Amino acid sequence: MATRSKSSQRWLKEHFSDPFVKKAQAEGMRSRAAYKLEELLERDRLLKPHMVVVDLGAAPGGWSQQVRRQIGDTGRVLALDILDMPPLAGVEFLHGDFREEAVLSQFEAMLGDQPVDLVLSDMAPNKSGVGAVDQPRMMHLAELALDFADNHLKTGGAFLIKLFQGEGFDDYVRDMRRRYDKVSIRKPEASRKRSPEVYALGQGKRAHMK
């Protein structure tokens, strides 16, 4: 118990001294994750006005907030999460479990027949702390996100997803390379150094898989 307490204290100390946490508080952003996305978007110039953007695993809303900030009042931002999220101006949000067919169908109905320019996925399972459990759960969510992009992302569009390095990672990246002209692995500055997370970016969705 004492170890857990020390671990919690260390996390709290790191969290409140984190420059990205302070920046988020100062700028009214919902999470420090907004700055991971900001770096990724700017580096690869992924956003343009009038785009249709889907944000999977959106809560508490930092990514959707960042997208809306960059594209202004143009385009559409559609967000989904198993956790509820307070409303954000200009963001269409669905509260539900992406793994459930009924929720996915409802989200697709919100989207209509509109092709998507950019699919973002920051989804992650609740961590058990056991890698042999967490990694397969993470990869399952990643497969669902890839399927969604297959079905709704327009030819030439981009797909950005959070992944944990571990079993299944290399195979997943290979699958992305069959679908996109260019695939890059990114570790933004706002990602904590000890975190296994990286972001895989697929650009130039192909009309047909290789």
Curated annotation (Swiss-Prot):
Region of interest (Disordered), residue spans: 187-210
Keywords from the named record: Cytoplasm, Methyltransferase, rRNA processing, S-adenosyl-L-methionine, Transferase
UniProt keyword annotation of Glycoprotein present: no
Ranges of compositional bias, category Basic and acidic residues: 187-196
Primary residence: cytoplasm
EC numbers: 2.1.1.166
UniProt keyword annotation of Metal-binding present: no
UniProt-annotated location(s): Cytoplasm
Database matches in Pfam families: FtsJ (PF01728)
Family named by the database record: Belongs to the class I-like SAM-binding methyltransferase superfamily. RNA methyltransferase RlmE family.
Protein name from the UniProt record: Ribosomal RNA large subunit methyltransferase E
Gene: rlmE
